Amino acid sequence: MVATPSTSSQTKGVVRQVIGPVLDVEFPAGKLPKILNALRIEAKNPAGQEIALTAEVQQLLGDHRVRAVAMSGTDGLVRGMEAVDTGAPISVPVGEATLGRIFNVLGEPVDEQGPVKTKDTAPIHRAAPKLTDLETKPKVFETGIKVIDLLAPYRQGGKVGLFGGAGVGKTVLIQELINNIAKEHGGVSVFGGVGERTREGNDLYEEFKESGVINADDLTQSKVALCFGQMNEPPGARMRVGLSALTMAEHFRDVNKQDVLLFVDNIFRFVQAGSEVSALLGRMPSAVGYQPTLGTDVGELQERITSTLEGSITSIQAVYVPADDLTDPAPATTFAHLDATTVLARALAAKGIYPAVDPLDSTSTMLQPSVVGDEHYKTARAVQSTLQRYKELQDIIAILGLDELSEEDRLTVDRARKIEKFLSQPFFVAEIFTGMSGKYVKLEETIAGFNMILSGELDDLPEQAFYLVGNIDEVKAKAEKLKSEK
């Protein structure tokens, strides 16, 4: 959806050069479009092929020419075609009508569900909120997921990096967060698929429908809007689709005054697309071939994701690390903006511990006594040190067995195993697979539960009672059930 001003204000230019996804357009003297304006080209080429594409102005070249980047394929585009300056940046639909729908970078629905029932649109380029409008007091965003809330709590209006390979539960974790923010916080979510596989986008959409996150029968009951610019799209679309998703999220925050979750999968592809566009525009590459404007590009997106006095956008961003090199400029620049990292470990998934969040590798700037309080901080650190000691003892156990450990170490191992099991939790969105009802665990219950394990109050309960339950009351009930079954 591109801004279409009144005919009198439209300036018409002519396409003079096409180089892949980049085109040069000549305009009348004194009537050049502004940088970031959308240009619309609708024409028939000599072969009779209908051309309809939108491009975004990136450079003013001189000689009344501008250079623009196309948001869709330029196949069939020829010199001499008319390009119209829309007089405004690309705009996308916003509001409740976007929920349950799938959009492309231009805000056009691509789910074959008909037009979007809203006239409200917003430009994808805008300034970050003013400092005076920001909520500066750090506030923990409760997710209801024990391992996250205790060991790597999210900041409301913060940015979280989600790291994990294939098949360790990223999608299910994302679905559970979307479900929990809708039920417990009355918030909505926006999912931005940036440069990932089309198949994954389709699978995600089908899984959302299956788990009830998208209500196919009544879209107004859906909890998420989706915005996709997949791997096969030109770099312009992949570079801007993150902003399209962010613009939809900003409307829910600023106009509806809601708490919003924004998912970006994958933030690395956003940087990668910017690098491609930069090269096409003829800019001199910087370190490792990235664009010289890397810091600015990432900053423009990240600084708009924040908590204001009216509402918040909490962002969870999947981060692909090229060749597992954390010093690569793309992930290194992204890390500078993150408040927390959630690392999913294959070893935990292999043990059947879900969510497979690594309790020792996941971090958060919120885990400090001045923010979460002394009790939460001490409990989290005690849990981590117990798990760390268990990790150190595993080599000895593998070689000599448990019997060779000291009494104290055996107790540590016993408690660590219970902690590891208690960090697992049944999810609402996985009910159809597990047959177990999902659990949302309040932070106070989480802290109390882990304190009881650490203090030794539950040493007599079997390890299995701690697996895939919510709070400690459920552990005790499960222990009774296991006892009666023997």
UniProtKB/Swiss-Prot annotation:
Q: What CDD domains does UniProt report for this protein, alphabetically?
A: ATP-synt_F1_beta_C, ATP-synt_F1_beta_N, F1-ATPase_beta_CD
Q: Which GO terms describe its cellular component?
A: plasma membrane-derived thylakoid membrane; proton-transporting ATP synthase complex
Question: Which Pfam family, an example, fits this chain?
Answer: ATP-synt_ab
The record gives the membrane topology as:
Peripheral membrane protein
Query: What EC identifiers does the entry list?
Result: 7.1.2.2
- What transmembrane ranges does the database entry give? none
Q: Which domain of life is it from?
A: Bacteria
- Name the PROSITE patterns on file: ATPASE_ALPHA_BETA
Quote the record's binding site residues for ATP: G164, G165, A166, G167, V168, G169, K170, T171
Q: Which reaction does it catalyse?
A: ATP + H2O + 4 H(+)(in) = ADP + phosphate + 5 H(+)(out)
Keyword Transport on entry? yes
What biological function has been recorded for the protein in this entry? Produces ATP from ADP in the presence of a proton gradient across the membrane. The catalytic sites are hosted primarily by the beta subunits.
The record's PANTHER family line, in alphabetical order, gives: ATP SYNTHASE, ATP SYNTHASE SUBUNIT BETA, MITOCHONDRIAL
How is the subunit organization of this protein annotated in UniProt? F-type ATPases have 2 components, CF(1) - the catalytic core - and CF(0) - the membrane proton channel. CF(1) has five subunits: alpha(3), beta(3), gamma(1), delta(1), epsilon(1). CF(0) has four main subunits: a(1), b(1), b'(1) and c(9-12).
| NCBIfam families to which the protein is assigned, alphabetical | atpD
Q: Which family does it belong to?
A: Belongs to the ATPase alpha/beta chains family.
Family matches, as HAMAP family: ATP_synth_beta_bact
Q: What is this protein called?
A: ATP synthase subunit beta
The protein's organism comes out as Prochlorococcus marinus (strain MIT 9312)
Gene name tied to this protein? atpD
